[in-house]
């Protein structure tokens, strides 16, 4: 999965807030029905520590230990650990999204005495569970924190300012840029909606964000064959198959909470993409 720079900026604002009080979104409480649907009371193998499932999952899973891989969609690192991208990673946020981080000991000096802030919320406080996943996108600079009241808006405004600066200094290059694809245009619209969200005190349940249809574009701007909603309330998001050019659902393909095996319903992707590229201005 390839994410645009714009989406990574917003993911950073949501997932990598510098302090617990700055997190924008909180998971809703787990209902008795959701908890009862968990497969057994605990994972089969003994765990050093149990944590809540990734995202807003309700079922207990084994925490990742020091040195194990981690990311946005993996189980959280155990207490006292953080999920760090590999040193020198060019796209640290994307590495975390792809699960290419590594659990390591917290560097408290980088976070302004995290013990004073409270490193983790107990797992039984599910009513107020934070979607933190112990992620760190890169080395933090003391005092270089986003404003508390609008981290999301700050990230969006910063990206807009960068776009304006690039457009002013590279007008000749802008004229040569190819037209944005349909997938990229839809992604821009979703980001605009996110930047305009008004939640009480800039907080709210994750459904406000997860309910948005965020398109999954590849590195060339086409739709990825498989599109999925994010997991929420302990359930995996639904996945379906689309045409990479138009984004429309492929006829006969299923919508499932798993792998819809899109390759069975789309057999000539390269030919169609080449034809579309030749027709594009």
From Swiss-Prot:
Residues covered by the Thyroglobulin type-1 domain: 180-262
Domain of life per record: Eukaryota
SMART domains named in the record: IB, TY
Residue ranges of the motif Cell attachment site: 257-259
Signal peptide interval: 1-21
Principal subcellular localisation of the protein: secreted
Pfam families assigned to the protein according to its UniProt record, in alphabetical order: IGFBP, Thyroglobulin_1
Compositionally skewed regions (Basic and acidic residues) per UniProt: 156-176
Record function comment: IGF-binding proteins prolong the half-life of the IGFs and have been shown to either inhibit or stimulate the growth promoting effects of the IGFs on cell culture. They alter the interaction of IGFs with their cell surface receptors.
Protein name, UniProt field: Insulin-like growth factor-binding protein 2
Organism listed in the record: Xenopus laevis (African clawed frog)
């Amino acid at each position: 999965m390839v994410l645009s720079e714009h989406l990574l900026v917003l993911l950073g604002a949501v997932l990598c807030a510098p302090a617990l009080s700055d997190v924008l979104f909180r998971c809703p409480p787990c209902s008795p029905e959701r908890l009862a649907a968990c497969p057994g009371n605990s994972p089969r193998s003994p765990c050093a520590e149990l944590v809540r499932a990734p995202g807003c999952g309700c079922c207990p899973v084994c925490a990742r230990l020091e040195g194990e891989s981690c990311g946005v969609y993996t189980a959280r690192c155990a207490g006292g650990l953080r999920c760090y991208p590999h040193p020198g990673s060019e796209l640290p946020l994307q590495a975390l999204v792809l699960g290419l981080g590594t659990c390591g000991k917290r560097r408290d000096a980088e976070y302004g005495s995290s013990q004073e802030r409270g490193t983790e919320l107990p797992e039984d406080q599910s009513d107020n569970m934070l979607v933190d996943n112990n992620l760190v996108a890169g080395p933090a600079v003391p005092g270089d924190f986003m404003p508390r009241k609008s981290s999301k808006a700050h990230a969006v405004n910063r990206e807009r300012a960068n776009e304006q600066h690039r457009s002013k200094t590279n007008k000749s290059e802008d004229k040569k840029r190819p037209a944005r694809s349909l997938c990229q245009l839809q992604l821009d619209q979703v980001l605009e909606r996110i930047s305009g969200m008004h939640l009480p005190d800039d907080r709210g349940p994750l459904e406000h964000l997860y309910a948005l249809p965020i398109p999954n574009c590849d590195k060339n701007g086409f739709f990825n064959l498989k599109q999925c909603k994010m997991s929420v309330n302990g359930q995996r998001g639904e996945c379906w198959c689309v045409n990479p050019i138009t984004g429309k659902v492929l006829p006969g393909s299923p919508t499932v909470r798993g792998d819809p095996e899109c390759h069975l319903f789309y057999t000539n992707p390269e030919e169609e993409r080449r034809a579309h590229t030749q027709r594009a201005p």
